[in-house]
């Protein structure tokens, strides 16, 4: 299950919440720009 974040009110959304409205809109404020939240990953770089 992917997590999304609204570009205006910054509330986190699930896939199920996005499917409730037609199109891609925030169910809270109606804003149409949604960002996908990625898990924080750590990249280990070997020192020279």
From Swiss-Prot:
Highest taxon above the source species: Archaea
Swiss-Prot/TrEMBL cofactor(s): Zn(2+)
Catalyzed chemical reaction(s): RNA(n) + a ribonucleoside 5'-triphosphate = RNA(n+1) + diphosphate
EC number of the protein: 2.7.7.6
Pfam families: Zn_ribbon_RPAB4 (PF03604)
Major location category of this protein: cytoplasm
Annotated binding of Zn(2+), by residue: 6, 9, 26, 29
A GO BP entry: DNA-templated transcription
Cofactor: binding details: Binds 1 zinc ion.
GO cellular-component term (any): DNA-directed RNA polymerase complex
Record key words, sorted: Cytoplasm, DNA-directed RNA polymerase, Metal-binding, Nucleotidyltransferase, Transcription, Transferase, Zinc
SMART domains: RPOLCX
Enzyme class: transferase
Subcellular location: Cytoplasm
Gene Ontology molecular functions: DNA binding; DNA-directed RNA polymerase activity; zinc ion binding
HAMAP family: RNApol_arch_Rpo12
Family note: Belongs to the archaeal Rpo12/eukaryotic RPC10 RNA polymerase subunit family.
Function comment: DNA-dependent RNA polymerase (RNAP) catalyzes the transcription of DNA into RNA using the four ribonucleoside triphosphates as substrates.
Subunit field text: Part of the 13-subunit RNA polymerase.
Protein name: DNA-directed RNA polymerase subunit Rpo12
Species of origin: Sulfolobus acidocaldarius (strain ATCC 33909 / DSM 639 / JCM 8929 / NBRC 15157 / NCIMB 11770)
């Amino acid at each position: 299950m992917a997590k999304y974040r609204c570009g205006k009110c910054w509330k986190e959304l699930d896939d199920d919440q996005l499917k409730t409205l037609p199109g891609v809109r925030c169910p809270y404020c109606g804003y149409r720009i949604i960002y996908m939240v990625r898990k924080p990953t750590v990249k280990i770089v070997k020192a020279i």
